[in-house]
Amino acid sequence: MKVIVIGATGSIGRLTVKNLLAEGHSVTAFARRPDRVGIEHSELTLRAGDARDAAAVTAAIRGQDAVVITLGAGASRRNKIRSEGTLAVIRAMQETGVRRLIVQSTLG
């Protein structure tokens, strides 16, 4: 399965990428600084972009089978990356026809 991980440079994102690769999936790691993923694998594609950038998210999601969102705001409670990024991803999925979504969140 082709899976994109949005927010792939955080601890949960990197672990998600590693586990998906170990299970035999083809993974795209999407992050502002994908060089920070720190994983090399023949089935891993690194893609730079901001989760709030609708055009970048849509382009990255096109052709994927599933999306995993592991966005985090870090220590800043004012950062709206989770809400704005998740909304951009959902809209991109609607536009591209990708139907599988997993969202990791610490909100609750």
Where does each model-flagged region fall?
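NAD(P)-cofactor binding segment of oxidoreductase domains
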Residues: 69, 74-103
